[in-house]
Amino acid sequence: MKTLVLVAVLGLASLYLLSYASEVQQLSVAEEEFGALIDAFGGLLETEERGVNKEGCRKFLGGCENTGQCCLHLFCKYDTPFNHFCAWDLSFGRK
């Protein structure tokens, strides 16, 4: 009787270990898939900030042709067709 109980307990323990190992393997596969998904969409999350560490960006009230030329927190504004300048875009901190 004692050996039968011991064999049953050992059998249950081995089944537990096998199912646990299978679950861990499935989790690692899911983590790999999630990592690949994040890498695929990572480019969408990273945005290039305008004017950060960019040589020659136009300062406040400097002449410009488009917003990409202005430094951070500035945009290219025009009041006449020939008068374009960098103006504050009313933002603070990091974008």
Swiss-Prot record:
Residue ranges the record assigns to the propeptide: 22-50
GO cellular component: extracellular region
Annotated signal peptide: 1-21
The UniProt record lists the keyword Ribonucleoprotein: no
Listed InterPro entries: Huwentoxin-1
Tissue expression as described in the entry: Expressed by the venom gland.
Gene Ontology MF annotations: ion channel inhibitor activity; toxin activity
Protein origin, superkingdom: Eukaryota
Alphabetical UniProt keywords: Disulfide bond, Ion channel impairing toxin, Knottin, Secreted, Signal, Toxin
Cysteines joined through disulfide linkages: 57-71, 64-76, 70-86
Pfam family, one: Toxin_12
Subcellular location: Secreted
Function comment: Ion channel inhibitor.
Domain notes per entry: The presence of a 'disulfide through disulfide knot' structurally defines this protein as a knottin.
Family of this protein: Belongs to the neurotoxin 10 (Hwtx-1) family. 26 (ICK-1) subfamily.
Protein name, per record: U8-barytoxin-Tl1a
Phylogenetic placement of the source organism: Eukaryota, Metazoa, Ecdysozoa, Arthropoda, Chelicerata
